[in-house]
Structures are given as C-alpha cells and as structure tokens.
Amino acid sequence: MERKNLHFETLQVHVGQEQADPATDARAVPIYQTTSYVFHNSAHAAARFGLQDPGNIYGRLTNSTQGVFEERVAVLEGGIAGLAVASGAAAITYAFENITRAGDHIVAAKTIYGGSYNLLAHTLPNYGVTTTFVDPSDLSYFEKAIQENTKAVFIETLGNPNSNIIDIEAVSEIAHRHKIPLIIDNTFGTPYLIRPIEHGADIVVHSATKFIGGHGSSLGGVIVDSGNFDWVASGKFPQLTEPDPSYHGVRFVDAAGPAAYVTRIRATLLRDTGATISPFNAFILLQGLETLSLRVERHVENALKVVNFLNNHPKVKKVNHPSLSDHPDHALYQRYFPNGAGSIFTFEVKGGQEEAHRFIDSLEIFSLLANVADVKSLVIHPASTTHSQLNAQELAEQEIYPGTVRLSIGTEHINDLIADLEQALAKI
C-alpha cells in the first residue's frame, strides 16, 4: 500500500522498514553498531563523498538505524527529509547555524524553553548572531522586529513551560512576506496532535528525548525539512545557493534539491562539530515512536482531568492551560489542537516559592526532575531550575513566578495522580 493511503498509527510503526531486514530477515530495525562503511571501489567512494550516491560514508554523518528513524519522523511530520542528532539542543542549534552568519538576526517568541532562550540570547551573540524576542500574543511585534538581516522566525507549537499557543499560519505569512523561513519546535505538540508544516512551517525541530522517546531513557533531536521553502528565490541564504568551498564547491540546492537545508547540516555542520546520535539511541527512540499515538492520547486525557482538578482547588491561584475557556489562547487551542494537547503546563500555588517547594517536596508519585513528556508524571519549579538563568524581568515576561510549578502529566491511573496532588496541596 502507498504511504499516502496509510494512517498515522500505521506509519509510526512501519515507515523505513516496511519489510524485514534484507540481510537477516529481522523484523525489528537492527542496531547497526559500526563507525564506518566499506566502499565497493574507488569510484563508489568518490560518488558517496560527492553526494552523487546518498549512501553511508562515516558514522558521524549517517547510520542505517538512524536513517530509519529520520525517515519515519520526517514522514510523520509531512516533510521530505530528516536529520537526527545527539539532542534537542543540538537540533535547535544546527537549525539556526545552518542559515546564519556573523551579523545576522533572528526573531523569536519570548515564551520558549529556557535553554533555547539562552542559546539565542547569550550563546549565539558570541558568534555575531543576535535575536529580538517578541510577545507572541500581538502578531504585529513579529512584523516590527524583522530587519534586513533577519534570517528566521522561531516559535514553539506549545510554549515551554506555560503551553501558550501562537497563530502559526499568521506568523508563517509574516515570515514568508519577508522571504525568510519559519522554524517551529514541535516537541510539546508532537506530529500526532499537530503537523506544523501543514500550517506554513518550513523547518520543524524536536527534542526526541521527550514524547518521541517517551520513557526518559535516551537523548536525541530531529530536524525535519518541509522542502517547501525556496532558498534560491529568497536570495538571502548563500550557504545553500552558492558554491561551498568546504565541500569542493557543491551548491546544496543543486546537489540535494528541496532537501538542501538538512543535507547541508549533515554534510558540513555535523561533519565539523559532530553532535551525532548513537545507533543505540536511534533504536530506542524508534521503539518509543511506535507507540507515540497511544501514549499521547493517554497523556492528554490525564492532563485535562488534572487541569480541571487544579482549576477548582482553593490553594491554586491560577492554572495556565489553553483548554480553559478563559485562557487567552483558547480559540487557537480549538483551532490547532482539535484532539486536545498540553500535558505539560504550569499552575501557580497561593503563597510563593516556599509553598511551591513544600508542595513539590510532598509529592510521592510525581518525580522532581528536569525532563518532561515521560510516561511517568514529573514536576519542577521553573524559576529556580529550568529558567533560573533568566532575570526577574525576563521571568515576569514569561509569566514564571515564585509560586509557579510545572507539571508533566504521565500515563499513570488518573485517580492516583489526583490523590497525590491533593495530599501535597493539603500540606501548604
């Protein structure tokens, strides 16, 4: 059967290995634990290095286990090509480094993961790339922030940690009007709940460590190229459209066509900086991917019940979740997430940091750690951990207060989760 006729739940299990492994007849994707690959002859080796033959060259660049994982995520996102790397942080870093140089500029929503914020606000400026952060609730701010040297707009489908939602299609129109790509982090959304490319995204990135892996056991990141952005017509990206002196004069738009973006990352950035995913991690993440839809359905089901419980609790000051009718992004939630979303969100306890810490320390089922999107329910205090690098003004702008608690709702029985939350709230 053709892939276009298959549903998500089938694709997440089969893409990349529709038949048994031809060498061993293994039905599971094998772990190809090797550093390098034998070329048939000298001409074959030259063709591989010249990008005329798309096969394996060296383990830092490609691996057959990794290749299945990349293809599967790309298909699930509706893209034409994918690249798996060592972590979500590496994926986001490469996504920007691939199309920026010293003197360039990025526009980003300010309601993003603290690690991404630090990358854009502090690390990339060391290399001459600056970022303007905007309030995504007013789309005019995106338009006003774009400059002649702006090379990308960056947002998340669901903001971290508050699960705010941005009008993707409207931001895409703004970016494309200025001939620059829209890069979206879909880690919290997952391709099961939303496919940003269908709403105008050009590049999608994931921390595969989260929902894709789903079990808190392996690090990984993925970059998916939609193949839709016209790098030549834009005229702003010589890295892709002009001969690359570091790769014997290749023009990536000629060598890779619509997959030029991810091909350049693999051929140059991954080659030179080596944030390579291990074959074993790619295998583990593939195992997680096969049950993505099943887990996400349970995550969302549990989360909505927890939101309702917290929203009616006398010791809770505020719940930040777009499913609530009074949430400012509720209409966007209904539009972009008809099947629900937001199993990672924040709420604010009455009092402050002392009460928040006492609540967290009293939980028994929820684990206090920095990860999210695990089958196990998780909790953390953002202001003193994940977002602690932000100053007081930056925290307030992201609506992270001393009493703010982030929850990542797992797949346990809902009655047990609510009972745990209830006993912990009773202690503050």
Label each residue range with its predicted role.
Residues 2-63, 71-72:
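N-terminal "arm"/small-domain region of PLP-dependent enzymes with the aminotransferase-like
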Residues 2-3, 16-20, 83-312:
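Conserved PLP-enzyme active-site core in the AAT-like
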Residues 9, 80, 121, 130, ...:
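PLP-dependent enzyme catalytic core of the Aspartate aminotransferase-like
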Residues 41-93, 115-123:
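Conserved N-terminal alpha-helix of the aminotransferase class I/II PLP-enzyme fold
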Residues 158, 187-189, 324, 350, ...:
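Active-site beta-loop-alpha junctions enriched in small/polar residues
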Residues 224, 346-348, 408-410:
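Short hydrophobic/aromatic beta-strand micro-patches
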Residues 273-276, 280-282, 287, 291, ...:
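Conserved small-domain helix->loop->beta segment predominantly found in fold-type I
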